[in-house]
Amino acid sequence: VYNTAVGYDAGSRITTGVQNTFIGGLSGDANTTGNNNVSVGKSSFSANTTGSSGTAVGAFALLANTTGANNTAIGNSSLAANTTASHNTAVGLGALGANTTGTRNTAVGANALDASTTANYNSAFGTHAGSSITTGSLNSVFGDYALAATTTGASNSAFGQSALGQNTTGHSNTAVGQNCLYGNTQGLRNTALGLNAGAGVTNGDNNTMIGEAAGNHSVATTVGNQNTLIGSQTRCDAYNSNTTVAIGYDVAGTGGYTTLGNAGSDIRALHGNITWATVSDERYKKDIVDSTAGLSFINAL
């Protein structure tokens, strides 16, 4: 039946399971009908009974798995609590270590997603990436300690070391850059791009901050909503400003106004409905030439 077992009690209860490889003391000890499993390490896959197509490499990897299928655990204690969940991938010490029934998660890095229990469709790459997520789903995390404090927050995307690092329940946020939106805890639908962009936001919603330290100056936007800040060190002039638009370098915008310019130069602040006019004036044109078409040309039309 093409089973291989090496180690004390390894694969000792196989009845009809085929094409299994169990190496290590108690490896695959409870397996009865599970097929196509590979387990290397002490007590790895030791509770599995009918789960199939699993790979466990490392002491206690997939330790509690019983019927879960198509799981891959590489690293000591990775996916150790998994019981019936399927289609999970964990690479690194303790990665997805608390997962029980959550499915289709990918964790790469020591302790990545290690608190996740029933969450689904999370991807985390980096040491402690998403390490506090318990039930939050549909998160994408790339970077050491990115989204590290999130528990139930969902649909967040964090790219960069410590991006969204203190987020707990906030959802639908996007942070690209080291420390981006780092201080956000409960804010929703914020977007930050650039080193330290939006790092001071805590509970603000629907903010867009693009540029190094945008929204994170001496007066950081913390609870303001619907602000758009574009340019390095652009910011609001109050921590609770709303509907601010600031575009430029090191410029502070005021709630309800559109502010354009750079520090040390002319800055223009616009307010209310703005009408743009297209002028037709010789003063604003160049490369003017005479028209050779006269009345005869017009009469011929």
Regions found by a protein language model. Give the residues of each.
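Glycine- and small/polar-enriched repetitive beta-structure motifs of secreted/surface proteins
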Residues: V1-S280
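Intramolecular chaperone/auto-protease modules of tailspike-like proteins
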Residues: V279-L301
